[in-house]
């Protein structure tokens, strides 16, 4: 509103002062003490004059929200009826924390007087998502992917990938698929290759990364025979991430990044529809011309999938014994100490973010051939990460990364800052190790975290000292299920977490073998 005429500025300020005068029935001697405040916001179209407002020290969030709405209504109406303005609830951030008490209580806690001018930032208030539904599966849920509308993809330690319908989560059985390679192997991660819900990439405890197509709509467990196995990792795969780009009008390519307990990161380029080139092969000797075979001489003909090697391999933690030396010694490569690594893609497929149990956090420039572009060193053990998204028109996201740690903390790492390691440390964010973080798909300020304490929290980086709200996975999803845990059972670990594409719902899964859906409304909306 800085570009509004001065008369509108004066009218808005005058209206705000009028709204704060005591009613005639209250004598000035009994009027509450006042404190000067300044109000600012980053919400587009919601700024009010940045001038001191004298408000009663007894005011709380609701009265402050009324003040902002009154000034906005008067200024935006520019003399017209205020009835057309629709009030919006606001929250207020002071000194990096949401205001959850009266102004005088805040001043008392800080040992400040009412003469101090308080700087408050107002943001749109968000109601917490409410538990909507849940489904149970046979084993722990190791990861969830809710990026596809109305489809929830889960990986499980029983080696099965399941696809749930979010509209009928508890009532409709999931489509269940067992990749052929994972019949006796636990899956650690599963991601959609693209938004059409027909292609999937999985990671496993065996170190295999596999890309395959969903074979149909069966609701029973079926093997997937045409899985392209991407071979590199010599230890369990700890994380995978995917970015899709259109190379021409008819083809899409998917970039996959995988990270493992061996300390390495592999970057792969695959067809986004998971349709790989194949070559027919028989049981005959190689090099012989194939011919039609009959009778007892007939041998089975199969299609061998041509799988690509990694585009590049990065070592977040230098191996104690590398692949070349291991081959010379006729032994297996040996990872370095604390080599367990996680990774994610940023800026589409132009950056790779990674963190390892050795306490290092890095990002790599893929365009420059995988060169190390930034490094942070901490005394923490990272368990999960997700890059913050930028809503600007810039082609690059802000080089910031959210990490969850073994010591129950969260941290924001800003690679624009060459001095400090953690730009924002959030100690005691949970009561147990933080196992999952997920940045909001719409808002540049919000992210969610899940932990071994069974809690899910939503945070605003503008108010890092406390979560916006905390959710708990319900102990029982159905009163008809007698085998469910009792209400006295301690909370179980959250292992997977994701937002739906519109950012209005959270999906979680974990140790309790359940997939839970929490539905909200207008979460992360940055306008009025």
Swiss-Prot record:
Against InterPro entries, the record matches this protein to:
G-protein_beta_WD-40_rep, NLE, WD40/YVTN_repeat-like_dom_sf, WD40_repeat_CS, WD40_repeat_dom_sf, WD40_rpt, WDR12/Ytm1
Q: Does the keyword Transcription apply?
A: no
Matches recorded under HAMAP family? WDR12
Query: Region (Disordered) spans which residues?
Result: 1-32, 276-304
Spans of repeat WD: 136-174, 182-222, 232-278, 334-374, 383-423, 429-469, 489-528
Write out the GO biological process terms.
maturation of 5.8S rRNA from tricistronic rRNA transcript (SSU-rRNA, 5.8S rRNA, LSU-rRNA); maturation of LSU-rRNA from tricistronic rRNA transcript (SSU-rRNA, 5.8S rRNA, LSU-rRNA)
UniProt lists the family membership as follows:
Belongs to the WD repeat WDR12/YTM1 family.
- Tell me which GO cellular component terms the UniProt record holds: nucleolus; nucleoplasm; preribosome, large subunit precursor
Q: What does this protein do?
A: Component of the NOP7 complex, which is required for maturation of the 25S and 5.8S ribosomal RNAs and formation of the 60S ribosome.
Q: Which Gene3D superfamilies match?
A: YVTN repeat-like/Quinoprotein amine dehydrogenase
On whether Ligase is a keyword of this UniProt record, the answer is: no
Q: Which Pfam families match?
A: NLE (PF08154), WD40 (PF00400)
What the entry lists under PROSITE patterns is as follows:
WD_REPEATS_1, WD_REPEATS_2, WD_REPEATS_REGION
UniProt lists compositionally biased (Basic and acidic residues) regions at 1-10
Q: What is this protein called?
A: Ribosome biogenesis protein YTM1
Q: Self-association or partners: how does it assemble?
A: Component of the NOP7 complex, composed of ERB1, NOP7 and YTM1. The complex is held together by ERB1, which interacts with NOP7 via its N-terminal domain and with YTM1 via a high-affinity interaction between the seven-bladed beta-propeller domains of the 2 proteins. The NOP7 complex associates with the 66S pre-ribosome. Interacts (via UBL domain) with MDN1 (via VWFA/MIDAS domain).
A GO molecular-function annotation? ribonucleoprotein complex binding
What segment(s) does the record annotate as region Ubiquitin-like (UBL) domain? 33-124
Source organism of the structure: Malassezia globosa (strain ATCC MYA-4612 / CBS 7966)
Question: Which UniProt keywords are present, listed alphabetically?
Answer: Nucleus, Repeat, Ribosome biogenesis, rRNA processing, WD repeat
Q: Which domain of life is it from?
A: Eukaryota
The UniProt regions of compositional bias labelled Low complexity, in chain numbering, are: 14-29
> What are the subcellular locations of this protein?
Nucleus, Nucleolus; Nucleus, Nucleoplasm
């Amino acid at each position: 509103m800085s570009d509004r005429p001065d008369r509108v500025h004066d009218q808005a300020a005058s209206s705000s002062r009028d709204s704060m005068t005591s009613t005639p029935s209250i004598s000035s001697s009994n009027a509450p003490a006042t404190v000067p405040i300044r109000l600012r916001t980053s919400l587009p179209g919601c700024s009010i004059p940045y001038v001191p407002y004298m408000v009663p020290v007894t005011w709380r969030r609701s009265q402050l929200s009324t003040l902002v709405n009154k000034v906005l209504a008067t200024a935006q109406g520019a003399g017209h009826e205020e009835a057309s303005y629709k009030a919006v609830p606001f929250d207020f951030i002071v000194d990096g924390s949401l205001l959850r008490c009266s102004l005088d209580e805040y001043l008392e806690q800080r040992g400040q007087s009412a003469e101090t001018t308080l700087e408050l930032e107002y943001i749109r208030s968000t109601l917490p998502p409410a538990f909507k539904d849940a489904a149970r599966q046979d084993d722990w849920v190791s990861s969830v992917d809710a990026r596809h509308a109305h489809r929830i993809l889960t990986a499980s330690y029983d080696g099965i990938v399941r696809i749930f319908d979010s509209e009928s989560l508890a009532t409709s059985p999931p489509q269940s698929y067992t990749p052929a390679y994972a019949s006796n192997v636990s899956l650690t991660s599963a991601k959609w290759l693209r938004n059409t819900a027909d292609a999937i990439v999985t990671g496993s405890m065996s170190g295999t990364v596999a890309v395959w197509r969903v074979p149909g709509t069966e609701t029973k467990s079926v093997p997937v025979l045409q899985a392209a196995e991407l071979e590199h990792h010599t230890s369990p795969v700890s994380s995978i991430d995917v970015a899709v780009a259109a190379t021409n009008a008819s083809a899409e390519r998917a970039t996959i990044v995988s990270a493992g307990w061996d300390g390495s990161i592999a970057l792969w380029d695959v067809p986004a529809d998971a349709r790989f080139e194949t070559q027919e092969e028989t049981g005959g000797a190689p090099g012989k011309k194939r011919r039609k075979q009959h009778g007892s001489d007939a041998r089975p003909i199969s299609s061998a999938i041509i799988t690509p090697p990694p585009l590049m391999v990065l070592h977040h933690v230098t191996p104690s014994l590398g692949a070349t030396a291991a081959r010379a010694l006729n032994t297996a490569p040996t990872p370095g100490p604390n080599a367990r690594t996680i990774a994610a893609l940023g800026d589409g497929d132009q950056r790779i973010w990674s963190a390892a149990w050795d306490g290092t956090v890095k990002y790599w420039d893929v365009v420059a051939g995988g060169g190390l572009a930034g490094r942070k060193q901490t005394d923490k053990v990272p368990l999960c990460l997700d890059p913050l998204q930028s809503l600007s028109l810039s082609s690059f996201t802000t080089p910031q990364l959210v990490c969850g740690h073994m010591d129950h903390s969260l941290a924001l790492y800003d690679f624009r800052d060459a001095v400090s390691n953690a730009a924002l440390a959030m100690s005691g964010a949970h009561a147990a190790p933080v196992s999952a973080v997920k940045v909001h798909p719409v808002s540049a300020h919000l992210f969610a975290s899940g932990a071994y304490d069974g809690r899910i929290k939503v945070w605003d980086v503008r108010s890092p000292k406390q979560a916006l709200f905390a959710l708990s996975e319900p102990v029982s999803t159905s009163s008809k299920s007698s085998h469910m845990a009792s209400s006295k059972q301690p909370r179980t670990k959250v292992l997977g977490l994701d937002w739906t594409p519109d950012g209005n719902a959270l999906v979680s899964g974990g140790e309790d073998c359940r997939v839970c859906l929490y539905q909200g409304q207008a979460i992360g909306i940055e306008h009025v």
